Amino acid sequence: MESGNIVNAQPELSGIIDGSKSYMYEQLWKLCAGPLCDIPKLGEKIYYFPQGNIELVEASTREELNELKPICDLPSKLQCRVIAIQLKVENNSDETYAEITLMPDTTQVVIPTQNENQFRPLVNSFTKVLTASDTSGGFFVPKKHAIECLPPLDMSQPLPTQELLATDLHGNQWRFNHNYRGTPQRHLLTTGWNAFTTSKKLVAGDVIVFVRGETGELRVGIRRAGHQQGNIPSSIISIESMRHGVIASAKHAFDNQCMFIVVYKPRSSQFIVSYDKFLDAVNNKFNVGSRFTMRFEGDDFSERRYFGTIIGVSDFSPHWKCSEWRNLEVQWDEFASFSRPNKVSPWEIEHLMPALNVPRPSLLKNKRLREVNEIGSSSSHLLPPILTQGQEIGQLSVASPMNISLTYRDTTEDVMNPSRLLMSYPVQPMPKLNYNNQMVTQIEENITTKTGTNFRLFGVSLVTPSVIKDPIEEIGSEISKLTEGKKFGQSQTLRSPTEIQSKQFSSTRTCTKVQMQGVTIERAVDLSVLNGYDQLILELEELFDLKGQLQTRNQWEIAFTDSDDDKMLVGDDPWPEFCNMVKKILIFKRGGQKLEVQ
């Protein structure tokens, strides 16, 4: 394409999404794409990494990506501008993807920018991970979501019901019967729901998304579970051809300053990176030993962070020299239920600064921080080995306990001036001690012998037993008294962060009451020690001596109430969500008289 054709292409620029798509479509697409989806803005300057684009098209075969050899001399990254973005969905799988039009950065074309201040209508939405009962029968809608995102029901009717009309990302309309019934009563989608799940081939673990606009327009979408992600069938077009196509398209655009289109999937690695984000990541200067955190999508559709350490910096492929793409080799702190990469790109992770990013225990968050001059030189007697222990902070996931030391930095300057190490905590002045003199004095004063004349080595008797107080133990005891016995401000004592967190956890953990029909005395069960519904049922059977009667559900039903006193059946929600909202567990006879909550 000649350079003169660039201006003629400008009227074809489309904008953030296809003009035929509405704002409701855009919001539904983003929810179906997931919490980690990062789409660039129209007109934004970005870096395009061909290696990442090739990795996406080769995901179906998982070849050795580091052995990929470019067919032509193409830079590892190209600076481009975003010309247009179209948000689309695959016909068969309902997987979201975006077609992003790029142009090598040039001033020859005036690129429209996205108006951030334009009016955005108010939308309500909710997502839910489907359970086995959701896919085999009616769909249970939690009361909060039903009130916020679905049209209101006429509760004056004996059986409140209505028909919902929802549109998916393909423009297809689906009709659902929404009613409020059952024992206990709850919001259900019945008629039409089975046809929807069958057509979309939904299974337990998939996610359903509902979006409702100000005008009452209802949209519905889905998001497949991670293990169901489809790939491009290699039988349709060879992997080699796709690889050559990606590189040839980028090379042609780079040489001729013309537009080219790339396909981006939300769950793929980010190979289109904001210019500012790239510079920030590179300026972090990740080195071997640096600590970091990285975001992933959890099984419950939520964002989760994992921590790790950089153990190497090298090119991902020998054919792409000095490329920032996956040039950091990492080691993860703990096991995960899904596969994580052992090489990542700098913009995918966040650098952990030990002195700044370690959360303080909530017990101390309201206390006034003392100024450096309040601590002064009174803490200069602290031994550096004690201050610098446990300095590997951040080796934890969001769900694991924190092991935080009182020390947040390990630099020569801090060792020379230990008072700076305690700036993050308010500590009362401690008496100035000289450990060298104290150690000698304590050794001399605490030696008791049975005879006045014996041989000594460094003040210790070599002949008769001596009663000697360990100087190191004495020092540690003194520090322990000063750090654990002194108070922050006026009332709070200093404890280890692990102890504080353990105490907070135990204080918030409460047992859940269990009420059974026909039994006067209530029982209680501790959900925090159980790992799922199976263990809960076994625990309930043991509490009421039912011996297998709850597992069959032939005689008894198990329900629970939430903070709004709404009754719902046990087992319809993911276990963590159930533990968060359960107020009381109810056991009542199947088909019998309703159990009144006490």
Swiss-Prot record:
Its main location: nucleus. Keywords: Auxin signaling pathway, DNA-binding, Nucleus, Transcription, Transcription regulation. The keyword Methyltransferase does not apply. One of its GO terms (biological process) is regulation of DNA-templated transcription. SUPFAM superfamilies: CAD & PB1 domains, DNA-binding pseudobarrel domain. InterPro entries: ARF_dom (IPR010525), ARF_plant (IPR044835), AUX/IAA_dom (IPR033389), B3_DNA-bd (IPR003340), DNA-bd_pseudobarrel_sf (IPR015300), PB1-like (IPR053793). GO terms for molecular function: DNA-binding transcription factor activity; transcription cis-regulatory region binding. It comes from the Eukaryota. It is found in: Nucleus. Residues 509-590 form the PB1 domain. One of its GO terms (cellular component) is nucleus. Residues 124-226 bind DNA. The keyword Protein transport does not apply. Auxin response factors (ARFs) are transcriptional factors that bind specifically to the DNA sequence 5'-TGTCTC-3' found in the auxin-responsive promoter elements (AuxREs). Could act as transcriptional activator or repressor. Formation of heterodimers with Aux/IAA proteins may alter their ability to modulate early auxin response genes expression. Homodimers and heterodimers. Belongs to the ARF family. This is Auxin response factor 22. It comes from Arabidopsis thaliana (Mouse-ear cress). The lineage of its organism: Eukaryota, Viridiplantae, Streptophyta, Embryophyta, Tracheophyta.
